[in-house]
């Protein structure tokens, strides 16, 4: 269909996405004869620049096991799929440096907590945050480790964007754990 569009209507087709896979094989198979031109120069260098984390699959974790892992870390973000799950994990964490974010909070309360969280991250103080997916988009925080309950790839990648966001740590020290 793409090849027909380009050929019959003398069109240029632009394919773009935030997480673009290699298109060479797809174009060779489904759009033979359609030349592909990379619009973004030096993509290999860009991939290297944005390779800031490594991923780990932890399998299924109980609330207790998850809270135990989180408690062993000084600074960590944990994103779960429901408010109920967030509350269940949060109540098992040490009180010092523990934060719970939910859409049930009024925006001003969330903003105040996010300000405190950012400051603790900067100061190197304990900061263990349990949140729903509200923190995945539009929230600028940088954790050394992120735990993400299994969700769609887009959600996992958004969560990964909260780990080593500023690129100050090597990827080997910036772990995104999917459970």
Task: Indicate residue ranges for each PLM-predicted region.
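ASCE RecA-like P-loop NTPase motor cores
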Residues: 1-11, 19, 93-96, 107, ...
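Conserved nucleotide-binding/hydrolysis micro-motifs of P-loop NTPases
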Residues: 13, 19-23, 59-62, 83-86, ...
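Interdomain hinge/linker at the junction between the two RecA-like core domains of SF2 helicases
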Residues: 4, 8, 12, 16-71
């Amino acid at each position: 269909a793409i090849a027909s569009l380009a050929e019959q209507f003398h069109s240029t087709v632009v394919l773009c996405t935030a997480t673009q896979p290699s298109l060479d094989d797809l174009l060779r198979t489904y759009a033979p004869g359609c030349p592909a031109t990379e619009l973004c120069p030096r993509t290999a260098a860009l991939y290297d620049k944005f390779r800031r984390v490594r991923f780990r699959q932890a399998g299924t974790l109980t609330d207790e096991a998850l809270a135990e892992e989180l408690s062993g870390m000084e600074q960590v973000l944990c994103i779960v799929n429901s408010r109920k799950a967030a509350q269940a994990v949060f109540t098992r964490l040490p009180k010092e440096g523990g934060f719970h974010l939910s859409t049930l909070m009024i925006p001003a309360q969330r903003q105040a907590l996010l300000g405190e969280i950012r400051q603790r991250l900067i100061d190197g103080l304990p900061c263990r945050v349990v949140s729903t997916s509200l923190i995945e988009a539009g929230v600028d925080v940088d954790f050394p480790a992120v735990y993400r309950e299994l969700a769609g790839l887009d959600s996992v990648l958004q969560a990964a964007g909260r780990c080593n966001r500023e690129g100050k740590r090597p990827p080997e020290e910036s772990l995104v754990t999917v459970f």
